[in-house]
């Protein structure tokens, strides 16, 4: 199989997401029959007392769900997972690898990082753990291809998210006569809705792009959603990924300025200022629309926002007290976390087998905030209509693209994150910001 290029990442995942949702019919619980038991201990021997060192993207909010997913494996095997999670985990993985101390398992979002590590011969083929047939038999072919580098299968995708979701309180909208947007709505419709809400003396938006070492990525998510839904947005998005279109293109500048139109217009944001936007953690920014009384009307963030909202406000009912409508234009970006290993030790392979199973992934799906790409986990497993709707959006979006900065990875990704933060603070420096991003290509 040929090497997976950055442009093929985009094309392959677009096909993969569609294939995955088409496979999710009614759950007859037979889809996972080809997998090993969720405990994953088959063939591992005695691994009790051993700890598997895992680096991943999930922080404190998502960690309890990951731990719930892993607990059956720990109970069955007597082994444990030693997990370190942070949003900037790609840099930590790189540092550990370059320092000669790689983790046993890594679960980042950056497909570009995975591809680079595999091409350098740093990763362990899944066949060394006896997992290749299992992955090929239970995951859509396009996802299998995306985890394959130079003909060798190194990784599998465990969790997917759409990022075409704007979160709101349906009751607040109904009380004020505001209409949620649809996939057919335009950017102008979103601006008009923003103006209408602002005129009611409620801040239309809550926006926070703080995220520790990776601050700025929520702003990048806004911008790539805008790019995809512009006129000829798919062509522009694809060109930015494969490098045929520079970041200094006037259409890219327009997309950033559209983000600024929302974030930097006085009265639009509950955080009150550019400094407030940069200082507010992205998780905390999901709260204001659902406070009593609400401090904002809307928050843009991927489908995983449902987890933060539900944890902060456990009495809210999905679909009644919080829901989402599609980003104007209907096109959706999204991402998926890839799982790969640096060794084939028995405990490492046993944990991989568990994480790859339908039974294990169904645990997190049922808890919420998780979309599985395993063909044995159906839409019926999702806990409510809001969660099912987020999974369904991956199929219904008129266009879908893999998260742009995750696909680019490395220095360019960090320049985009830093650029988003700088733009919020100093919008008059946009030309310089875009030139700096382009200089990393």
Regions flagged by a language model, labelled:
Residues 194, 238-277:
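Glycine-centered hinge/linker elements that transmit conformational signals in sensory
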Residues 174, 392-441:
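Conserved C-terminal helix/tail region of periplasmic/extracytoplasmic solute-binding proteins
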Residues 22-115, 120, 132-133, 363, ...:
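Conserved N-terminal structural module of periplasmic/extracytoplasmic solute-binding proteins
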Residues 154-158, 191-244:
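Extracytoplasmic/periplasmic solute-binding protein
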Residues 71, 176, 298-371:
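Extracytoplasmic/periplasmic substrate-recognition and gating elements
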Residues 127-139, 183, 209-213, 229-254, ...:
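Short, solvent-exposed loop/beta-turn-alpha elements that line the ligand-binding surface or hinge
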Residues 41-46, 109-164, 321:
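Hinge/lid segment of periplasmic solute-binding proteins
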């Amino acid at each position: 199989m040929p090497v997976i290029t950055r442009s093929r990442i985009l094309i392959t995942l677009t096909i993969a997401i569609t294939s995955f949702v088409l496979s999710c019919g009614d759950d007859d619980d037979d889809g996972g029959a080809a997998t090993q038991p969720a405990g994953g201990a088959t063939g591992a021997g005695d691994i009790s007392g051993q700890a598997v060192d895992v680096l991943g993207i999930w922080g404190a909010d998502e960690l309890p769900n990951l731990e719930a997913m892993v607990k059956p494996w720990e109970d069955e095997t007597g082994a444990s997972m030693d997990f370190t999670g942070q949003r900037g985990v790609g840099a930590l993985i790189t540092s550990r690898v370059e320092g000669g101390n790689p983790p046993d398992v890594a679960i980042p979002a950056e497909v570009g990082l995975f591809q680079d590590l595999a091409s350098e011969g740093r990763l362990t083929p899944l066949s060394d753990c006896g997992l290749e047939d299992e992955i090929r038999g239970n995951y859509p072919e396009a996802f299998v291809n995306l985890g394959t580098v130079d003909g060798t299968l190194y990784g599998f995708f465990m969790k997917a998210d759409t990022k075409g979701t704007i979160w709101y309180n349906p009751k607040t909208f109904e009380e004020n006569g505001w209409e949620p947007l649809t996939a057919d709505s335009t950017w102008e419709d979103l601006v008009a809705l923003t103006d209408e809400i602002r005129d009611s003396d409620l801040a239309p938006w809550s926006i926070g792009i703080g995220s520790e070492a990776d601050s700025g990525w929520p702003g990048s998510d806004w911008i790539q959603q805008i790019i995809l839904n512009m006129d000829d947005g798919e062509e522009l998005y694809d060109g930015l990924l494969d490098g045929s279109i520079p970041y200094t293109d006037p259409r890219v500048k327009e997309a950033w300025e559209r983000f600024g139109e929302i974030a930097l217009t006085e009265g639009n944001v509950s955080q009150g200022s550019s400094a407030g936007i940069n200082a507010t953690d992205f998780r905390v920014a999901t709260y204001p629309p659902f406070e009593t009384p609400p401090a904002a009307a809307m928050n843009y963030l991927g489908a995983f926002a449902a987890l933060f909202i539900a944890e902060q406000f456990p009495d809210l009912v999905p679909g009644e007290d919080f829901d989402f409508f599609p980003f104007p234009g209907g096109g959706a970006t999204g991402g998926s976390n890839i799982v790969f290993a640096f060794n084939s030790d028995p405990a490492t392979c046993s944990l991989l087998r568990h994480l790859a199973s339908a039974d294990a992934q169904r645990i997190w799906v049922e808890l919420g905030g998780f979309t599985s790409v395993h063909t044995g986990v159906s839409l019926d497993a999702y806990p409510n209509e809001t969660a099912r709707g987020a999974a369904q959006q991956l199929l219904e979006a008129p266009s879908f693209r893999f998260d742009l900065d995750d696909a680019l990875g490395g220095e360019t990704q960090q320049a985009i994150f830093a650029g988003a933060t700088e733009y919020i603070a100093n919008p008059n420096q946009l030309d310089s910001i875009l030139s700096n991003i382009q200089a990393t290509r």
